């Protein structure tokens, strides 16, 4: 038989956290047997709807995996390469338990070191159910991590803005300076460090 969508191993991959000034970049990889009702691009869902959808994905997906690149890796590699590393890690988790025929990656580029043929899908988080599912998992898992970082590093508001460059975050950086979770390679943080 020839591989096809669903249980035969078409993996959707997406990330969350490329743009924030703090925290990791998180990627998810998902194999679906069939589309799951209510699962669409994570940016189109409320936080509550994303959480419900994430629970459905975790229970109904044929396979799923998560990869991340932390702040140290982001600063050492750059955000593009760190994102690809997180994606490759997520796909590797899926590959441990599920055969992979093809990897569909949201965006214009694909990582080099994937265990199967891959292709980019521009706007894939709205077009491909497996990428939509990956988008939701990556976003909910990263958001949960940022809430924990808010407790570990109070005063920055990570639980509210999730590390993105809001006015609140800018004020906190100016008042407190960067914490270990800030991406020193990002211009707003680098400027505060005198770079």
Curated annotation (Swiss-Prot):
It comes from the Bacteria. GO terms for cellular component: cytoplasm; ribonuclease H2 complex. Its EC number is 3.1.26.4. GO terms for biological process: DNA replication, removal of RNA primer; mismatch repair. Transmembrane segments: none annotated. Pfam families: RNase_HII (PF01351). The keyword Cytoplasm applies. A divalent metal cation binds at residues 14-15, 106. Keywords: Cytoplasm, Endonuclease, Hydrolase, Manganese, Metal-binding, Nuclease. GO terms for molecular function: manganese ion binding; RNA binding; RNA-DNA hybrid ribonuclease activity. Endonuclease that specifically degrades the RNA of RNA-DNA hybrids. Belongs to the RNase HII family. NCBIfam families: PRK00015.1-3 (NF000595). This is Ribonuclease HII. The lineage of its organism: Bacteria, Pseudomonadati, Pseudomonadota, Gammaproteobacteria, Chromatiales.
